[in-house]
A protein has these predicted regions:
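C-terminal polymerase-core module
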Residues: 381-388, 392, 399-452, 639-688, ...
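Conserved RNase H-like, two-metal-ion catalytic cores of nucleic-acid enzymes
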Residues: 5, 9-21, 25-29, 156-288, ...
Length: 789
């Protein structure tokens, strides 16, 4: 019970009741039609106490849980007309179904028997939680719709039949059936021990085959038979007219290519990517998708439970379920894409990009293993020394010779900062931003500043050691990463990256400068790089219709190297001649040798942050300004560019009115829950950030699909607004010309268009003849522009 429920002695009063009965109203049910009770009959802890103690989920003892379980089951048995039960929240779900995790089981309808009578239990979130988190509201309504389907007689399970342990002949026959069928087919792999355990296929929504290569302890096929099956699968996945469907196909595809040398030429439909395009705010796992598009209960635990139960056949059946559910979702999503005018963008951009990201993962990037080992050894010593310096600084600052702490522990650092040294920051966070605030605070003495400086140095080196220097590479001495098309929540269209599923590699989009020498080109190759200059700010200039910015950016484009848009902004903000603005971000004092940031740097930081509703206190941190200087810069920025706030206002008004925003490229943001002020920042940033991501991503497939692109050249890295290709030096001019030509294609904004200039670099060989990421240098002349279509 909530505090308010306890006061009036009635369940679901206030906001939680409104959430629940708004959903039940669509089932033609009111309070008079339902019996309400608590799974746990007492309030374990009040909301105020829970907040004070930092308790998110109150815990009930096993003894008390068992007592309330018996009470609830007895209570239900006394309801003669009850047929359906809404189990709302983790305790209700566990008591009635025995299942843990409301996040997994929400949306499931489970048949249970209580005191000899059968019931259907519909699982969902606790309405109290939904009332506090608007993002859960759409999910809650989806789950309550299951009750509506039951009452209307529309509830229907998929009834999937899984054909497992096929003979060689049956496996080959089914692959042929799939290949020569004109219908879409789903595929899915499962892995064990870092090897492919099976490949599942389905051309029917209720029947599929798992071609499992092994049993619990033996191989199922001879070496010859398995080779023939794998070749048949390669032929199937290479068929141009085949309509292959998968959930998160990029994983299956890069795994099959790297591990099994089976290359999926082009997945026709990825349900995860389609769902991400249709409903960006929702989760996109297959478990969630199944709860949205089918009436079947949660099943994803079946992929793990077989290990405990020792029944491997359940694993193969699970594989077939994945295939059939994916096919069910694909059929429904295709209709939704067409109805919502998203199908063209989905097939012509989202799906077109995917095989190129797979290629980037499989190709990887060569590592200088000798340098990596040297850096690791040196850093291991450095980190140990830095940790000792932290102890010495803390002992001096506290005046305690025996003081000891772990600088990697936020809890122990928090005790040092706030209890022992009495430092002042914002709250009790020990993150980098708050450490900077504490360092700059007037009450922080020199000894305490030395503590912060040493902790910063230790954390920087320790992170570099664990994240970069000690990163696992593959047996072929390559770094790899998995590029995710759904990875950036607030900017769909931008790519994120992470380690690959077999455990090696790392996020290659945030590599620090001192790690870049480890990344090298293959022998006989060089790196070609381009960065889309101020792409987001240029898009903001168009969206907010800022004539002055448009003119500045165009002047910078047609006069590369001689005119700088950030200097122009600084000139306007501080009302000084353009030629008096330093062209660098930092200048060094010839007397002290200390560097300080320039007006250009501050203007650039303003443009990067203040476009998206950043407040001046945050600007103080990002631009390394005092609060007073940050407020001055904030006011100057918006005074000289009033169009920015006008753009915010019209964007928010449109979002409230239409509940959606669509970029000029065709990607959509959609508001599915009730309006929430916290969504404002992401709404403002959505169009420029998503457009930037989609534009850069499009250059990847446009280049590699161009018939002029050299056969052995490839894009190897996406670094936000930049791409890096690897090519033979003789092919460099052509590679860079194609990259520029596609990167600088005019982008249509309706009444106007814009060209975003691309700044280029090329790697230079060192004394050892090796081209490294760290040796990229600016080109003296811009690449040629070619005609593209």
């Amino acid at each position: 019970p909530t505090d308010r429920d306890c006061r009036v002695n009635q369940p679901f009063i206030g906001a939680s009741g409104q959430v629940l009965f708004d959903a039940l109203k669509k089932c033609n049910l009111s309070r008079n039609h339902v019996y309400m009770t608590y799974a746990i009959k007492r309030q374990v802890i009040s909301a105020s106490q829970a907040k004070l103690q930092g308790i998110k989920t109150p815990v009930v003892s096993k003894q008390e849980f068992d007592t309330y379980k018996n009470v609830l089951l007895t209570e239900i048995s006394y309801l003669p007309n009850c047929k359906y039960i809404l189990a709302l929240g983790s305790y209700a779900i566990k008591i009635l179904t025995g299942n843990d995790s409301v996040m997994h089981w929400r949306g499931s309808v489970i048949d249970v028997s209580i005191a000899g009578r059968d019931y259907k239990v519909i699982c969902g979130y606790n309405p109290t939680l939904v009332a506090l988190d608007p993002k859960l509201e759409i999910v809650f309504r989806m789950d309550m719709n299951k009750l509506s389907r039951i009452l209307e007689g529309k509830f229907q399970l998929a009834n999937i039949y899984a054909e497992i342990n096929p003979s060689f002949k049956d496996a080959m026959s089914y692959i042929a059936d799939v290949r020569y069928s004109s219908r879409p087919f789903a595929y899915d792999i499962e892995t064990m021990g870092n090897e492919t355990a099976c490949v599942g296929l389905a051309i029917s929504e209720n029947h599929g085959m798992c071609i499992n290569f092994r049993t619990q302890g033996t191989n199922r096929f001879s070496t010859r038979e398995e080779l023939v099956i794998r070749r048949a699968l390669q032929t199937l996945f290479s068929t141009p007219e085949g309509k292959s469907v998968a959930q998160n196909a990029n994983f299956d595809n890069y795994w099959l290519w790297y591990k099994d040398r089976i290359q999926v030429s082009q997945t026709w439909f990825d349900t995860m990517l389609a769902h991400h395009l249709l409903y960006p705010p929702l989760p996109h796992s297959l478990g969630f998708i199944v709860s949205q598009y089918t009436d079947d209960p949660y099943y994803k635990d079946e992929g793990k439970l077989w290990k405990a139960e020792g029944e491997i056949d359940d694993f193969w059946r699970y594989n077939v379920k994945d295939c059939c559910y994916t096919l069910i979702a694909q059929r429904r999503m295709l209709v939704e894409l067409e109805e919502q005018d998203l199908s063209k963008f989905f097939f012509d951009h989202v799906m077109k990009l995917q095989p190129h990201l797979t290629r980037m993962t499989v190709g990887g990037l060569l590592c200088d293993t000798q340098l990596k080992e040297t850096i690791t050894d040196e850093l291991t010593r450095t980190v140990g020394e830095a940790k000792e310096l932290c102890q010495v600084a803390a002992q001096k600052a506290t005046g305690r010779a025996d003081y000891a702490f772990n600088p990697a522990s936020p809890k122990q650092c928090g005790k040092l900062f706030f209890e022992d040294l009495k430092l002042v920051g914002r709250g009790n966070s020990t993150n980098k931003e708050n450490r900077e605030r504490m360092y700059k605070h007037s009450r922080t003495n020199s000894d305490s500043r030395a503590v912060i400086t040493n902790i910063d140095s230790y954390l920087r080196d320790a992170k570099f050691l664990s994240t970069y220097a000690s990163a696992t590479i593959d047996p072929d001495d390559r770094f790899r990463c998995e590029y995710k098309q759904t990875g950036v929540i607030n900017a769909p269209g931008r790519l994120s990256s992470s380690a690959v599923m077999w455990g090696s590699g790392l996020n290659l989009q945030n590599i620090p400068e001192r790690a870049k020498p480890m990344f090298i080109a293959d022998e006989g190759y060089e790196f070609s790089y381009f960065d889309a200059a101020q792409i987001e700010a240029r898009f903001v200039a168009m969206l907010a219709n800022i004539p002055q910015w448009k003119a500045q950016f165009e002047m910078a484009r047609v006069n590369p190297g001689s005119y700088d848009a950030h200097c122009a902004l600084a000139s306007v903000m501080w009302n000084i001649p353009y030629e008096n603005v330093p062209k660098e971000d930092f200048v060094v004092d010839p007397v002290t040798g200390l560097s300080s940031h320039t007006l250009r740097f501050t203007a650039k930081r303003c443009r990067h942050g203040l476009n998206y509703r950043m407040a001046y206190d945050r600007l103080a941190t990002t631009a390394n300004l005092s609060m007073n200087d940050a407020q001055i810069a904030y006011n100057l920025y918006h005074r000289t560019t009033p169009e920015i706030k006008d753009w915010w206002r019209t964007t928010i008004e449109r979002a409230k009115r239409d509940r959606k925003i669509t970029t000029p490229f065709g990607r959509r943001w959609i508001l599915m829950e009730r309006w929430d002020e916290d969504a404002l920042d992401s709404i403002i940033a959505f169009v420029p950030q998503s457009m930037a991501g989609d534009h850069i991503a499009s250059v990847i497939y446009k280049c590699e699909r161009d018939v002029r692109w050299p056969r052995d050249a490839r894009i190897v890295l996406n670094i936000h607004d930049a791409l890096i290709a690897i090519n033979r030096p003789a092919d460099g001019p052509l590679v860079r010309a194609l990259m520029r030509s596609y990167a600088e294609e005019p982008i249509d904004f309706g009444d106007d268009s814009i060209i975003v200039p691309a700044d280029f670099k090329v790697s230079k060989p060192g004394e050892d003849g090796i081209h490294r990421w760290s040796t990229l240098g600016k080109l003296k002349e811009r690449p040629e522009l070619l005609s593209v279509t």
